[in-house]
Amino acid sequence: MGDILGAVYDLGHRPYLARRTVYEDRLILSTHGNVCRAINLLTHDNRTTLVYHNNTKRIRFRGLLCAYRVPYCGFRALCRVMLCSLPRLCDIPINGSRDFVADPTRLDSSVNELLVSNGLVTHYDRVHNVPIHTDGFEVVDFTTVFRGPGNFLLPNATNFPRSTTTDQVYMVCLVNTVNCVLRFESELVVWVHSGLYAGDVLDVDNNVIQAPDGVDDND
């Protein structure tokens, strides 16, 4: 379910609406100490061919890193969290974290150069120190912005008569221990044309949530 946050207008068109959807997920890291999860960022409105003009997608990830390993309570684990995306179509197969880094057994491993040369963008990459017990956690909280349908990086004022491909966004985790659990919430804000939604519109601070390209926030 999503909340309609507000609306802005561009000349000659109906208003755009900001729709927010919150996802929750849990990643249980395998005994190999690394995991990769593809994240589908499309909201219900995006699954139609009627998506109009550019979309600006502002995503806030708030995760709780929890590590559990009996009987070693009181120790801490290191967990590297990465959020990556492919801003254009890429036919390179991705089968897990080992495809994102050169050596998935090392927390300081470099990012796969082949993916980088094919347009891989790293939006977040940080190592967290996580307590190993049931009550402790480390907070991961960051915001990033994607532009255009399918995360394609396109110039301003480019119009799209229909939707394109789904987003290729991946959460990658590398840890130096086993039985770690990553719980996270992701808040997605996407602008859609008002022709896709006929419900109530709430006020929103448009200086916080960026409008689509070519749309005047002050209108």
Curated annotation (Swiss-Prot):
Motif (Nuclear export signal): 169-178
Renumbered residue ranges of the record's region Transcription activation: 103-146
The keyword Acetylation is assigned to this record: no
Main location: host cell
Location of the motif Nuclear localization signal: 57-62
UniProt-annotated location(s): Host cytoplasm; Host nucleus
Source organism superkingdom: Viruses
Keyword annotations: Activator, Host cytoplasm, Host nucleus
GO cellular component terms, semicolon-separated: host cell cytoplasm; host cell nucleus
InterPro entries, per database record: BNYVV_p25/p26
Self-association and partners: Homooligomer.
Family under the similarity heading: Belongs to the benyvirus P25 protein family.
Protein role: Pathogenicity factor implicated in symptom exacerbation. Might function as transcription activator (Potential).
Protein name as annotated: Protein P25
